[in-house]
Amino acid sequence: MEGGGKPNSASNSRDDGNSVFPSKAPATGPVAADKRLGTPPGGGAAGKEHGNSVCFKVDGGGGEEPAGSFEDAEGPRRQYGFMQRQFTSMLQPGVNKFSLRMFGSQKAVEKEQERVKTAGFWIIHPYSDFRFYWDLIMLIMMVGNLVIIPVGITFFTEQTTTPWIIFNVASDTVFLLDLIMNFRTGTVNEDSSEIILDPKVIKMNYLKSWFVVDFISSIPVDYIFLIVEKGMDSEVYKTARALRIVRFTKILSLLRLLRLSRLIRYIHQWEEIFHMTYDLASAVVRIFNLIGMMLLLCHWDGCLQFLVPLLQDFPPDCWVSLNEMVNDSWGKQYSYALFKAMSHMLCIGYGAQAPVSMSDLWITMLSMIVGATCYAMFVGHATALIQSLDSSRRQYQEKYKQVEQYMSFHKLPADMRQKIHDYYEHRYQGKIFDEENILSELNDPLREEIVNFNCRKLVATMPLFANADPNFVTAMLSKLRFEVFQPGDYIIREGAVGKKMYFIQHGVAGVITKSSKEMKLTDGSYFGEICLLTKGRRTASVRADTYCRLYSLSVDNFNEVLEEYPMMRRAFETVAIDRLDRIGKKNSILLQKFQKDLNTGVFNNQENEILKQIVKHDREMVQAIPPINYPQMTALNCTSSTTTPTSRMRTQSPPVYTATSLSHSNLHSPSPSTQTPQPSAILSPCSYTTAVCSPPIQSPLATRTFHYASPTASQLSLMQQPQQQLPQSQVQQTQTQTQQQQQQQQQQQQQQQQQQQQQQQQQQQQQQQQQQQQQPQTPGSSTPKNEVHKSTQALHNTNLTKEVRPLSASQPSLPHEVSTLISRPHPTVGESLASIPQPVAAVHSTGLQAGSRSTVPQRVTLFRQMSSGAIPPNRGVPPAPPPPAAVQRESPSVLNTDPDAEKPRFASNL
């Protein structure tokens, strides 16, 4: 250095981060022989350089340059260290899908890598990348050896060709290396699933297991063959002794086929890898392994079929000599031998010719045994594979077979069997899963993710879920249960106790109420929440119009979820109040709670906006149907489901003016009443329209179901629709038919009451004497009185006489006064009640003429007699004024002294 340099400094040195020299280290470099160390000019003790400063002088110049770069000095060593690290890492388990599944986490894999480093030199981990690729190479080499070696030994006489020698020498070398590497490869302890990396334990385990088989299969037969060939002359080699040696080497080469054990082990390891990663790939690999093993055995059997005659020098009775194939090409010989072997193994024949010699016979039997075993294994594995590929469909088929046996055992009708079949098709769609058990085995996040995915269409179509908290939606969906309903099924019924609410995923359902309006619910709608909120009964019926796929929520789960989310409870309550208002109903519990929330200020502006949107969307989703043109829907709960065709025809007849409603006040009134008609009141056309258009009266009769008779007069007032009157000829014809039926019934009853005729004759004689005494005073009025007296007395004593018609579902018996009033013609459409002529007998006296008894038309439905013999009174019509005192004294039995006469009584089946 010129002018003296600082110690510990190097002039013109490059500061690249790697020029760090150890203290007191001699300067070395590749150019040290061509350059010499220099000192500063006029050097002295003070001008000496520090030992760590490496400088040199170039001839002919005073400049200084470094003696050599550290990178040049450490390059080979650094490259060797990199290769060593890479090779060492290949002996360790890598971080991949297989190792993560084996050890659980990346941290556990790193710990296993540290174990391999501390285990010793050249210890190979069984799950390392190096062992993976080595096993792949060995798999290919073994398949090649097991296919090529039998063909070469059997069909090729020249064993000294260069390709054959190269192939055999390379194979023997690779298998010897594999034998050595097995002593340095860790093993898996089957009891504890721990990887054993101790070299001594690995060696002992290998010596006790597969070492002998692997050593015999790895004997270098080709090396021995080459040594024997070089030690013999060509003339001696061709002698018979040499040919025997060659045959021995051929037989010895068959020991390589023991490498099949290695092939099976490696294939089993690959099956485990595929099984742990892909289940379907594992099944496919298993079936392909089975097919490949069968083909390999067929290949070996074909070579064996030709090798045995070859070792016997083709005797005359062998199959090769009989078919004259000794001098044919090896391809033709192999084809015939393979065909013969497959015929034996599949048990379909003997090939081209049946065996003749004893050796061919034994080989054929051996082939049949091996073939039958392989065929059974193949069928079993194939069956198991097919069943495992679609186990859910197989379970569905087994389940439906049980259902069919159940239907046959109980002898269910064909239409019911078809409904059950359709239900299973729509409910399970050909596959059965134990979904509840599957989801219960998963953790909560994964279960919630699956439920959200399965119900994504329901969430997308429901405005309630769209505006709700995601946690509420997840909690609600996790408690839903899937259900399917068929067209015509009543999902809920009005008046029933509600235990579930429903969400519609797919389908259309109709809401049926007592009013004439029906509403439709489609995808994304929900119903049944009102009774869950109020703990009451169903307010309407819901019927499935199409196949409906629903999700149900029980009342316990409903309350459990809403306790954690009070805002959503208020949303349900608001929608419930709006729905009740739309169908004309109210619920005091919901209204009081809603008013209480308003007074306490629970609702804020944001919540109000959300509730408005929910109610708005709920109204938009409900499809309202226009009012139905027939009024039967107004009495939906009043009519029986077993209505006869006659009663259905009656509901479409013109309005009927019943005699029970004709009181004295009505007869004397100048105009019909304009008030809301009562269930059994007389209706004019205008008042009838008012009754149909107005909501029905909530009376006991309006909610009563009559099971045995036709609709009563109160029901007809709600159900019948004004139409044009029937022609008089049809009315007369109907009356004639009714009269004939009554006469037949009267004759039958007369035969049954022969025992009572004597008592009736005595009563008639007494009545005739009274008539003779009263005839001058009131002519023509005594007979009706007596008849009325007889009929009412019989009804009061609950005894039916011949004067009273028998009670039946189609022809109820009535007092003669009522039948006489009904026999009058009906008023026209525009005629008022004042124009009806008043019956004289009804005004002046309580009796009627004896000859005025008429029949009741078939299209008229009247009250039936009760078990007590009285007619049910009408609560909607004011009672008639009492008759005169004279009439009361003469016929006291006409009056009804029963204190319960004003209570409503319904028809009963006698």
From Swiss-Prot:
Changing residue 350 to A: Abolishes conductivity. It comes from the Eukaryota. Activated by cAMP. cAMP binding causes a conformation change that leads to the assembly of an active tetramer and channel opening. Compared to other family members, cAMP has less stimulatory effect on HCN1 because part of the molecules already contain bound cAMP and form homotetramers when cAMP levels are low, this inherent tetramerization in HCN1 results in a weaker response to increased cAMP. Gene3D superfamilies: 1.10.287.70, Helix hairpin bin, Jelly Rolls. Residues 875-885 have a biased composition (Pro residues). It is a multi-pass membrane protein. Predominantly expressed in brain. Highly expressed in apical dendrites of pyramidal neurons in the cortex, in the layer corresponding to the stratum lacunosum-moleculare in the hippocampus and in axons of basket cells in the cerebellum (at protein level). Expressed in a subset of elongated cells in taste buds. Keywords: cAMP, cAMP-binding, Cell membrane, Glycoprotein, Ion channel, Ion transport, Ligand-gated ion channel, Membrane, Nucleotide-binding, Potassium, Potassium channel, Potassium transport, Sodium, Sodium channel, Sodium transport, Transmembrane, Transmembrane helix, Transport, Voltage-gated channel. PROSITE patterns: CNMP_BINDING_1, CNMP_BINDING_3. Glycans are attached at residue 327. It is found in: Cell membrane. Residues 900-910 have a biased composition (Basic and acidic residues). Disruption phenotype: Deficient mice are viable and do not display an overt phenotype. However, these animals are defective in the learning of fast motor tasks due to a malfunctioning of cerebellar Purkinje cells. Mice lacking HCN1 developp severe sinus bradycardia and reduced cardiac output. One of its GO terms (biological process) is potassium ion transmembrane transport. Homotetramer. Heterotetramer with HCN2. The potassium channel is composed of a homo- or heterotetrameric complex of pore-forming subunits. Interacts with KCNE2. Interacts with the SH3 domain of CSK. Hyperpolarization-activated ion channel that are permeable to sodium and potassium ions. Exhibits weak selectivity for potassium over sodium ions. Contributes to the native pacemaker currents in heart (If) and in neurons (Ih). Participates in cerebellar mechanisms of motor learning. May mediate responses to sour stimuli. The segment S4 is probably the voltage-sensor and is characterized by a series of positively charged amino acids at every third position. This is Potassium/sodium hyperpolarization-activated cyclic nucleotide-gated channel 1.
